[in-house]
UniProtKB/Swiss-Prot annotation:
Belongs to the SHMT family. Homodimer. One of its GO terms (cellular component) is cytoplasm. One of its GO terms (molecular function) is pyridoxal phosphate binding. It comes from Bacillus cereus (strain ATCC 14579 / DSM 31 / CCUG 7414 / JCM 2152 / NBRC 15305 / NCIMB 9373 / NCTC 2599 / NRRL B-3711). This is Serine hydroxymethyltransferase. Its EC number is 2.1.2.1. (6S)-5,6,7,8-tetrahydrofolate binds at L118, G122, H123, L124, E240, S350, P351, F352. Its main location: cytoplasm. The gene is glyA. The lineage of its organism: Bacteria, Bacillati, Bacillota, Bacilli, Bacillales.
């Protein structure tokens, strides 16, 4: 199929080839990214991209859905097996749309919701004023403790009692510690609120049994299907059976039309991979690598938000290096290490500048990097940031990155 693309559209082919080269030659540390299997890519590039299938298995608005019904049922059944969910909807095109569907299911415009502050580790869809969630609903923020940088559950309870939200949102996009979902449910029950958990970043760790599972505690669980779950880009919703019909209606016909059946097929393949024994080994290696990388960074004198990590994610506070997150992201990319600038708790810089850098170990672990490689990456990051204006040092860092990536070939069959 790549041969067809090359003949048909040289410009698009060239851009894709260049991206493949980038992924092969750089160290991918963006916490929300991963490398899917070739089987997942084959499913996503299959003839299922041709099929419209509005509705759900057994109740479609189009004919000819007998085979895509099988695929969607496989995906749903595998998610139920992985997470122990009563009901699953695998049609959301993204995590943001999964969150939107839950909001539309139980909230009215202007309802009060308690969500995590974006700079403290939350997500745009958890009430940011520039996002639909912050526009449509009255979000009240909770955050982390100023000293420990961990969620202060007593503060969450106090704010829940004060504001009496209809919904509490737990989960994060930049929080490196375990979240106590049981405690969140207790708080929700105390104030009569629903609980939604967004486990997008940690879903793969939950699937492997290496992070507490929110499903037994939450009324609704949303997630992306990529990140640590190592599937295609997309979303899904897990919920109690009592909300099944409402959730399904919120997705279709509520906020989406036809599902992307080729993506759902790729999701199904990834879920099948997550059920294999070696996926637990992979997830454990993600955590081991993150801990080793965090230790290495601290030995190099770098400051980590909350002092370390319990999952795949590390947040570096770069202020003591007298640079910004924006500068750190740029200079690391220049030497071949891909990260993203990120706000930190109690941030004073703008979101376009930031005081932090967010990194994660899911992608490099998929590539086969282990503890020794984490030591080298920690050294490389510190060396690059401390010498960000020294071109000779940056050239040396580039050579070290090249030496490291050359040992771990990527997608040799592509």
């Amino acid at each position: 199929m790549v041969d067809h693309l090359k003949r048909q559209d040289e410009k698009v082919f060239a851009a894709i080839e260049a991206e493949l080269g980038r992924q092969r030659s750089k160290i991918e540390l963006i916490a929300s990214e991963n490398f899917v299997s070739e089987a997942v890519m084959e499913a996503q590039g299959s003839v299922l991209t041709n099929k419209y299938a509005e509705g759900y298995p057994g109740k479609r608005y189009y004919g000819g859905c007998e085979h895509v019904d099988v695929v969607e049922d496989i995906a749903r059944d595998r998610v139920k097996e992985i997470f122990g969910a009563e009901h699953v909807n695998v049609q959301p095109h993204s995590g943001a749309q999964a969150n939107m569907a839950v909001y539309f299911t139980i909230l009215e415009q202007g309802d009060t919701v308690l969500g995590m502050n974006l700079s403290h580790g939350g997500h745009l869809t958890h009430g940011s004023p520039v996002n639909f969630s912050g526009v449509q609903y009255n979000f009240v923020e909770y955050g982390v403790d100023a000293d420990s940088h961990r969620i202060n559950y007593d503060d969450v309870l106090a704010k829940a009692k004060e504001h009496k939200p209809k919904l509490i949102v737990a989960g994060a996009s930049a929080y490196p510690r375990v979240i106590d979902f049981k405690r969140f449910r207790e708080i929700a029950d105390e104030v009569g609120a629903y609980l939604m958990v967004d486990m997008a970043h940690i879903a793969g760790l939950v699937a492997a049994g290496l992070h507490p599972n929110p499903v037994p505690h939450a009324h609704f669980v949303t997630t992306t299907t990529h990140k640590t779950l190592r599937g295609p880009r997309g979303g899904m919703i897990l919920c109690e059976e009592q909300f099944a019909k409402q959730i399904d209606k919120s997705i279709f016909p509520g906020i989406q039309g036809g599902p992307l059946m080729h993506v759902i097929a790729a999701k199904a393949v990834a879920f099948g991979e997550a059920l294999q024994d070696d996926f637990k080994t992979y997830a454990q290696n993600i955590i081991n690598n993150a801990n080793r990388l965090a230790e290495g960074l601290q030995k190099e004198g770098l400051t980590l938000v909350s002092g370390g990590t319990d999952n795949h994610l590390i947040l570096i506070d770069v202020r003591n290096l007298e640079i910004t997150g924006k500068v750190a992201e740029h200079v690391l990319d220049e030497v071949g290490i891909t990260v993203n600038k990120n706000t930190i708790p109690f941030e004073t810089a703008s979101p376009f500048v930031t005081s932090g850098v967010r990194i994660g170990t899911a992608a490099v672990t998929s590539r086969g990097f282990g503890l020794e490689e984490m030591d080298e990456i920690a050294s490389l990051i510190a060396y690059t940031l401390k010498n960000h204006e020294n071109e000779a040092a940056l050239e040396e860092a580039r050579k070290r990155v090249e030496a490291l990536t050359s040992k771990f070939p990527m997608y040799p069959n592509l």
